[in-house]
Amino acid sequence: MSFNQSRSDKNEGYTQYRKSGRSNNFNPQRGSSGTHSKPGGAGGSAPTSSIASNRSFKKTNNAQGGQSRGGLPAVNSTDSSNAPNPRGVQNGAVAKPPEGPHSQRSTRDVPKAPTSQSAPLSSDGPAPTTPAKGTGDQPKEFAFQFGSISPGFMNGMQLPVRTSSAPPNLDEQKRDQARHESFRPVPPMPIPLAPKPQTQRKDTGAGDQPNVGQQLQQKDTGIINQPNTGDAHTVQKAKKDMQASPNHPTNQTQKPTTPMSGISMTMPYHPPQVPVPFGGPNQQMQSQGLTPTSLHMSIPVPLQIGSSPQVQQPMFVPGLHPHPMQPQGIIHQGQGLGFATQIGSQLPPQLSNLGMNVTSQYPQQQGGKFGGPRKSAVRITDPKTHEELIFDNKQSNAYADTGTSGPRPPYNLPSQTQPLPYAPSHAMNYYPNSYNPNPLYFASPSSLPLPSGQSAPNSQPHRFNYPVSQGSQNVPYIDMHVKKPSGGPMHGISDPPNREHTRDTHTFQPPAPSGTVHVTIKMPTDPTGGKGSDTLPNKLPTTEEGKSQKPSSPSVDLIPPSQRAVDTTSESSLHDSKLGREPSGIKSSPVISKQFTDGPPMVSLESQDSSSVQSSLTASSEESELAVAHSEVRRENLLGSDLHKDHQKKTSKKGYAQSLQHQISGQASSALGVPCQVQDTTSPLVSEAVEAKSLIIPAVVGGKSVSVSAVTSDPLESKDAGLVSVAHSSSPENPGLGNVKNLDLISDDNQDTSSKEKNSEPVVLKIEEQGQATFSEPPVDLKNSENVLDHDVSKSVEVAEKTERNLIVSSATVSNEVLTSETAQRAVDEPVSCNAEADVSASVSSSSTVPENSQDDKLVVDSSGRYDNMSSNEVLKNVVKSDQPSEPALNPGLSEGKNDGEVLDTVGTCANSSQGVSGTKDKSVVETSRVKGTTGKAKKRLKAILQMADAAGTTSDLYNAYKRPEEKKETVAHSESIERTESRSSSVDTEQESNEAIKEDAGALSKAEPDDWEDAADIATPDLESANGDGVGTSMLDSGDRTGDMAKKYSRDFLLKFAEQFLDLPHNFEVTSDIESLMSTHTNVSHHHDRDPYPSPGRVDRPSSGGSRLDRRGSNLVDDDRWSKLPGPFAPGQDPRLDLAYGATAGFRPGQGPNFGVLRNPRAQAPVQYAGGILAGPMQSMGPQGGLQRNNSDADRWQRATNFQKGLIPSPLTPLQTMHKAKKKYEVGKVSDEEETKQRQLKAILNKLTPQNFEKLFEQVKAVNIDNGRTLTGVISQIFDKALMEPTFCEMYANFCFHLAGELPDLSEDNEKITFKRLLLNKCQEEFERGEREQEEANKVEEEGEVKQSEEEREEKRIKARRRMLGNIRLIGELYKKKMLTERIMHECIKKLLGEYQNPDEEDVEALCKLMSTIGEMIDHPRAKDYMDSYFEIMTMLSNNMKLSSRVRFMLKDAIDLRKNKWQQRRKVEGPKKIEEVHRDAAQERQAQTGRFGRGPSINSSARRGGPPMDYGPRGSVVSSPGNQMGGFRAFLHQPRGYGGNQDARQDERQSYEARTLSVTSQRAGGDESITLGPQGGLARGMSIRGPQPSSAAPADMSPLPGDLRSAPIASLNGYSSASERATLTSKEDLISRHMPERFAGPTSMDHISSPERYSNYGNKDLRHSGRSFDRSRPISPATPPGPALTPSLPSEKVLSEDRLQQLSLTAIKEFYSARDEKEVALCIKELNSPAFHPTMISLWVTDVFERTNLERDLLAKLVVNLSRPNNGTLNQAHLVKGFEAVLGNLEDSVNDAPRAPEYLGQILGKVITESMVSLREVADLICQGGEVPGNLLQSGLGADVLGNILKTIKTEKGEGFLTDLRTNSNLRLETFLPPDPVKSRVLEEFI
């Protein structure tokens, strides 16, 4: 019985047989009572029941809610060996003794038929007695899983053979089923000895098992061959070691029908079951073994993913435990899987406990109903009669799983979470009422879903969350009345819902030994390829996938009455239902259910264009019909859950006829979607086929009868190859259908690799079109080929299996040509992917039709539903042919033999079948991937598709960006339906019909309240795809109108599916600009999936967001990359489920939470961040809370934005529009004229010129070839332009000219010598005169006829002229200082400016003052004294001229005073500064302000009064007083917390001020003693003065620093800790690094903060006085006990060591560079009180300055001179001589560090000599004796360089005359200083 059944139905069996342990394990194996030893299920038992967790693959139903838990052990499964050992089997395949198949309780397996067992069901051969539990001798049983049924025996009951004409009584069946429910530990009825085929499969334990059941069996088998991902739970023997995505097992857990996600399972995901090493070979186990404990549990919530809003999911309050898990009661978030397996399904509503604000999309599920009643019934209209066939909701409930209009799981990122291991195979229904009386729970207010996990808010990502059929939460069509699990197919489960639903159809059990199973499948002709109609006797409201998924295209399953008639065996009430229109060219996908019995089974596959698909498996002797009913309703599920289901199905072995039935139309995305897989009982490992059995499957495809023959090896043997030949003759009823000439399926054993492609070989489906069908036109009679059995294998592509064979369905286009896709699965990277289990996606056939004319086109659908082998041209043909609607008919109903490699996925293709691919479009592909445990090609492909979609499609605008990628389209045009872009309609379907269909579909959809405006819009316009308004996925109805209008529109997602298949463009393809832009945009994302098979967690491959994703996540295979993207606590390769201890619920990915795509379900707000799925309390956001992440093509892009600010949604990247390209495009810097190129280069250099990069840029100028007068003139003009407009930088530009003049050679043009100086002089004169002209023009009155200027314009001109003139004057003065201009020129300029002093011009006077201040000192020499006197007399007179403005008069007085003051500026004229100087000045200014703030009367008062000197050490320093310590440390401690750069600058400032304020206010010294906040001074020193100072102050302050301060960025206590400051304040400027240790207390304590990198901020403060003040305090504080801790406390008498003196002296000079306070330096030197150290100090200073800037060298020279002046007395000549002697002695070493040391030393000595501090003769003698060895300097040439630079400096400073006099007086012979050859000294040679 399906777990979804209402409890009332199940109560009998359930209560009776329910295992107590099951409650704890969501999916404890029901079948094996032993399995769940304890209620908690957490114990090892859980592992035992890895399958037993009732997530057994059968549990496929779990998600669906219908699967028998018992399925866990393969009964008597040889593989499972019936090992009761809990973990004996991978994932504890089934430790418990296999119970009868019934015990396993294939939820859906049990037909609804009366309990009476109808022997007829069994095929000839022994009655399908299911072996007793685990009787090894008996034929292997199949563990029942969704859709897995012992063919003749259901849960111990044999179903009477039903004629197709008489629909089964579903209610009756349900009741019976309930009685026999597999819940019972013991089969309700004696189990027939004959193994049910399923049972056998179980035994087979291998690929043969039904989808889920098979996997369960595998578990039983203990073989690691569990379904790849466990989605399919296909037991792949070959893959035993394979790690199927562990997630899938969880999927199988699917028991939680729906919202298991939210449930925090009692964590006991039995670790054993989950071999954590998901990456381990047995990852599959994980999925299976996880049973209850699967971390999947953290299924975010049953969020509806698809557009199917129809079924509202219950809201869950994250914090609420909706209902206690079965026995366990409510599971607390941290708890182990508390829910009984069964509960899992129920949990759906609260599954996740993840509170989701999501309005429950599914109304509360009534007993047994998971996913809630379906809102809408699927209406199938007969194309001809237009009569509606509505399936009863109850029935739909039974299959509710199949039809999920709810959001597709694929979008639920949670899919990764999806696998709720605990979901019982039974629908969670049991508890829904009791525990979830009201599905509505209010989610936590947090509206932001964890961004990293993208889970549809309403869908539970876990595949198992929903009843099997339910699939992901696509529960849109769940009929509450139905007792059976409803809800979208679990993602992890492949069509399990359908399988479960198969109970509706009678599953006959062919004799295990052998027999021909005749399966008659009537394919619903669902135009959209949705599950057109289930064969349910009652009318199922099957919502076309398109509808449920996307209202965009109403999908209607049309079954021509004739076909329906043909479908005599069909149980479905479809016959009863009236089909309004005849689907012309409807493709019905035959579903082949291949079950291997001992004998070759014969499967007759009839696909008729009927809404119902029936499959009957008959023993060779007897033919039973198994009506495959699947709710078409689930179309949406197909899309969303399709993927899940597909995966599940595939994984579960689509072999389940049930699943076939259910998903044939919907989930399989095609009739095949419900493929029955024949699983060979034998291990797939057997390479050879001992016996080949022929399987003949007659199928009617699109009204044509097709017989498929498959040669299968003996069940006991691995099926080496299955050859299926399909001969198909078109029936007159479906003239439009092409004939399937032959379908050749060859699957070889994995070992037989000779002809196999490693990844997979496509099964070739050859369709021969006997006649042309004109779909858009009235159907043309096609040649009818009577059932021709064609064994021709047009192409046998061997499917290479990694462990499983991927069955690739190649869909032949109508042409005879067989479409082969060698590469169809090349994209399948995952081993499991090979197991593409006839993914629904693969089953794309549903809505795709082969273009009529695309005879040559090849379409291959791999299990992933991909078109691999099609050439790009082919794709273009199929996709783009606008002239003819093309719909490749692919029947994705592929069921792969699990591990056996037995692939009997028959893709029935009807050329005309317009069945919409259910979700195959996008989802199919993804689904398949999902199914593959590891990673699905499809998934990768999906990833690529999504990425490509990002590049090409919806991103064009925000609206599209927020939308899910064409979900609607998905329904409409599924991946496989690409060619079918416009489904053809052979019959003339009027637009009216199409509208009617739309209305019907819309009506069904409308029944479910649209979740948002998008849905509403979709419903309003269901067909968005076709140009003319017809939905692409619409049934052929739509295409009827379109015959004339061939313009086709393809959804982006649809087209993108070909992205990876077709990488090469056609030869003649023209890449237009718009295409090129898209291509370029796509490059960044196209191959992401290659390295990240599992798309980023936030971006689940849309189609399969179900359990498979969960499995993947659970597995270690998960890419580290993907996990690393998650900010959450989960380690990159770690399964979050393992982290439950951390409070994360199992299966809950860090960011996972409902993710509502932007407006997808605006009402569904993800509650708080789900911690681990259950509301563990708002955890720290594991991921950016920013943009809601969606599971759509944009998801990955959004997912990557993990660092967005909260609340910000990054705008998706949209493809850039191609820029208009001019014929002759402009290229930057490209100039034809060489001269212009040079000028541009020079201008660029000048624009970047600054004092800092002067030297570097000057080298670039030299690199420019200035080789003619024109270029040279241009350079000078540019320099003048820059200088005149930037007067502040005149000095720099003059220096530039000076260097340039020295570097440029003399040029000659026309025999005329051209020199730079000459051109420069001309330019100066020109500019000077030009300035006068401009002034005159600005002042003159306009003459008549001239344009009159306004006063503003005139003033503007005047200002501009004045600025230029002043700049010119200043530049001239600077050039003169550089000796570029002569003194005579200067005098001429002055005279010109004085001009008419009687009537002075203010601008001229101002310029004169500026010039005098610039060059006055140089021209005021004795020889020019007369001139200067006359100038200043005039200036004095002008200064008293009241006609001048006061500003100008004061300027004149300043110039006069300047001359009187010997040209010494009262204040330094500020010129350009380097950045570090700017920082220093800013620091000083700030320090001065804080000093005023914290100190007493005045800054220097204490020092002058003898009080403790101020300390300018870093304010708030760590060594401040104890009171200050806390405040000071606050800043330090804050920063590490902010991780450095994150800290707000204002915070730093605030903290620093807090520290300062605290220290100042808390302990303010009394009196007028100033208190410095520095480390040594201020409070600390004040304390020492007033009383004893704790000697440990400094160490104590330092010790508490957290960690090593050098590494942690610390907020500057003075608030000045910008990065630039830290960068610029290098060790050179950071005096603290060297002197602070002494000041503080010991080098050791200070070491923590001394280094500049650590405390660059120390440089911020003005440390000018620190060294001095520290030391000066010594004499003041003799009372302080001497100690090493504090320098200030040292007694004054103590003589400092040499090292100490060096450190202090360096500290003092560094302070001087910053503060430029010579007095402070003098005080520091006096405090050293060591005159003998002065020469060494000078030596240290000079050597140190070699590595400093020119400015600092100038400062040092002036300092030395001033300190040596007699009036100062700090230094004397002897000190200087000895000091320079030491420098010269070490010059050879200094050159290594500072190559230009000789130049710098010469500059310093030149200035000292100029000031007469030392004579040139003395210096020359020092040079001669200099070097480590006396005389070495001369030998090396360094001495000559030093002397040459001395002379050069003297000449620059004092002029050539002064130098000549000096040389004469010194009596030097410069030749003696020249180095021996070959060494040269150019500098000195200039003076010789």
UniProtKB/Swiss-Prot annotation:
Q: Which domain of life is it from?
A: Eukaryota
Stated consequence of mutating L1056A: Impaired eIF4E binding
The record's region (EIF4E-binding) falls at 1048-1093
Could you tell me where the Basic and acidic residues compositional bias lies? Answer: 171-183, 497-506, 631-645, 963-983, 1109-1124, 1467-1484, 1661-1674
Q: Does the keyword Ion transport apply?
A: no
What InterPro entries does its record include?
ARM-type_fold, Initiation_fac_eIF4g_MI, MIF4G-like_typ-3
Q: What is the effect of changing L1078D?
A: Impaired eIF4E binding
**Low complexity: compositionally biased ranges:** 603-630, 840-850
Oligomer status and interactors: EIF4F is a multi-subunit complex, the composition of which varies with external and internal environmental conditions. It is composed of at least EIF4A, EIF4E and EIF4G. Interacts directly with eIF4E. In higher plants two isoforms of EIF4F have been identified, named isoform EIF4F and isoform EIF(iso)4F. Isoform EIF4F has subunits p220 and p26, whereas isoform EIF(iso)4F has subunits p82 and p28.
What spans are recorded as compositionally biased (Pro residues)?
Answer: 185-195
Residue ranges of the MI domain?
A: 1700-1824
Q: Where is the signal peptide?
A: none
Q: Name one GO cellular component term.
A: eukaryotic translation initiation factor 4F complex
Q: What is this protein called?
A: Eukaryotic translation initiation factor 4G
Q: Which family does it belong to?
A: Belongs to the eukaryotic initiation factor 4G family.
Listed PROSITE patterns: MI (PS51366)
One Pfam family, short name please?
Answer: MIF4G
Gene3D superfamilies recorded = 1.25.40.180
Species: Cucumis melo (Muskmelon)
What Gene Ontology terms for biological process does this UniProt record contain?
regulation of translation
Free-text function comment from the UniProt entry: Component of the protein complex eIF4F, which is involved in the recognition of the mRNA cap, ATP-dependent unwinding of 5'-terminal secondary structure and recruitment of mRNA to the ribosome.
Q: Where is this region: Disordered?
A: 1-259, 391-420, 449-662, 726-761, 838-903, 961-1042, 1083-1138, 1331-1356, 1462-1605, 1639-1691
Q: What positions does the domain MIF4G occupy?
A: 1239-1462
Q: Name one GO molecular function term.
A: translation initiation factor activity
